[in-house]
């Protein structure tokens, strides 16, 4: 008895359609990463191996409140997008479970938040990233995290300019109080 199965062509056709949809999704993800790399002011890569889900969610909430977009992508897809944008030196940092933090409003915020949390959570490892359209190493990223943010720098400048004026006003007030000069 000769029995033929006509299910094989249907199965392969459905499987091929599924693979095409996976491939389309990967192309969309690479395009998304490409867009983020072009539109972000900075990128910090952090390895989160061994971190609990609660700690990771807490880190993501802190990123979100600072205006930092954090995403987990497959390293292979990120490598493709990095190559498309000319960031070939990033490939050495794309090993292991990585979280990508894109600085959209404040360029220093991703590295600063990661460095602060890495002190409390030694499992967080600040890797390289992108700052000012240049690939930076982990050591350079650590230096960037020590820089003041834009608002902190403005506050420091304002207090630096205000301090001599306060001292002059205080000195003049003392002279007036001692009646060495008249107002």
UniProtKB/Swiss-Prot annotation:
It holds the Pfam family Ribosomal_L10. InterPro entries: Ribosomal_uL10 (IPR001790), Ribosomal_uL10-like_sf (IPR043141), Ribosomal_uL10_bac (IPR022973), Ribosomal_uL10_bac_type (IPR047865). One of its GO terms (biological process) is translation. Keywords: Ribonucleoprotein, Ribosomal protein, RNA-binding, rRNA-binding. It comes from the Bacteria. The keyword Ribosomal protein applies. GO terms for cellular component: ribonucleoprotein complex; ribosome. Transmembrane segments: none annotated. GO terms for molecular function: large ribosomal subunit rRNA binding. Signal peptide: none annotated. Belongs to the universal ribosomal protein uL10 family. Forms part of the ribosomal stalk, playing a central role in the interaction of the ribosome with GTP-bound translation factors. Part of the ribosomal stalk of the 50S ribosomal subunit. The N-terminus interacts with L11 and the large rRNA to form the base of the stalk. The C-terminus forms an elongated spine to which L12 dimers bind in a sequential fashion forming a multimeric L10(L12)X complex. This is Large ribosomal subunit protein uL10. It comes from Mesomycoplasma hyopneumoniae (strain 7448) (Mycoplasma hyopneumoniae). The lineage of its organism: Bacteria, Bacillati, Mycoplasmatota, Mycoplasmoidales, Metamycoplasmataceae. The gene is rplJ.
